[in-house]
Every structure is written in C-alpha cells, then in structure tokens.
C-alpha cells in the first residue's frame, strides 16, 4: 500500500468513522488507530473504560468495517 493510500484511509477513519463509532457507543470510544502492513489492515478501537477491539479490513471494505464496528458496539 502506498503512503497516499494509507493517508486517505486513515483520514476516513479519523474524520468519518470515529464520530460514528462514538455516537453509536455513547462516546465510550477513546480512540481509533489505523494500522497497515503488507499482509493486513486493521483498525484498533480503544474504549475509555478499558478494552480493545481489533477489526480486520481489506483494501476496499471500509463500508464493511463501519458495519462490523457498529455491530460490535451495539
């Protein structure tokens, strides 16, 4: 994945997905972290009360990511 692709995905996560997740989970989400390697892409969700969720994503499945996150926090 190029640096540009990483930056675009990370920006989406932080500007679009984080507010959605916080609203869905009543602001219990402390932070989201986007990680990418040659083998996988992962969004790590850290909750304010403790706990972490790792959500695996593929290069073209940000919608699936949003749906998966919403299922996990509801």
Predicted features, each with a name:
Residues 28-73:
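Short, charge-rich amphipathic interface segments used for partner binding and complex assembly
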Residues 2-35, 56:
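N-terminal acidic leader/helix
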């Amino acid at each position: 994945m190029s640096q540009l692709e990483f930056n675009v995905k990370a920006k989406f996560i932080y500007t679009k997905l984080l507010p959605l997740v916080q609203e869905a989970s009543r602001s219990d989400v402390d932070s989201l972290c986007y990680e990418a390697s040659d083998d996988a892409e992962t969004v790590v969700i850290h909750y304010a009360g403790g706990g972490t969720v790792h959500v695996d994503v593929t290069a073209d499945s940000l919608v699936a990511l949003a749906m998966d996150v919403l299922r996990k926090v509801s």
